[in-house]
Amino acid sequence: MKLSDIKKVYGSGSLEVPVLHGINLQIEEGEFIAIMGPSGSGKSTLMNIIGFLDYPSAGTYQLNGKKVNSIKENQLAELRNKHVGFVFQQFFLLPRQNAWKNVESPLIYAAIPRRERMNRAKEMLAKVGLEDRVNHLPNELSGGQKQRVCIARALVNNPEVILADEPTGALDSKTSEQIMELLVQLNKEGKTVIIVTHEEEIAAYASRVITLKDGMITDDRRRAHEHMGEL
């Protein structure tokens, strides 16, 4: 992924609100990146552009050498479904569907057979420690459990890239550690992991930390994983 002079402006005319100011960023396959910065710095907007949820107002976004910032919405949706798993700060769970049906939802669009969808969804729920909650509705789950369902949903389509906006925000410290270790393991397996966080202890799991302020990158540093031993 390569972002060149990416700008994002919301509104128009006298109501224009610039959010990103000329972002230049190259992301290599298999990186583990944390994006940090104060509220309003543009972190989530940048993540939305990286994850094909939003178009930049100006600049060039390349994926594997191909420009993607000017492709049609249906092609953008296909890229999202095939390449990216999302974990949002809000849960976005279907209130009338149980945990495994929420987790399987990305697979429906990929035309995966029902039995395989169910098996993969339950496998992912077990991976995040919810094997005993597969039939529970969202209103029967705690906030932390809901967030883990979201993480399982992000993993179920076996994406190349995992984008997580405050992935541990609703979790206690022990569960946060388990979730981050899971993301570390997925990164070891070759997945690119990009998280937005305001917590230094969560960013410490990443090997590269990018800091935004007022829509600009003010720091981009690489470091050894503090929680990953030899990696």
Where in this protein do the model-derived segments appear?
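ABC family nucleotide-binding domain
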Residues: 1-212
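Conserved beta-strand-loop-alpha-helix hinge in the C-terminal portion
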Residues: 216-231
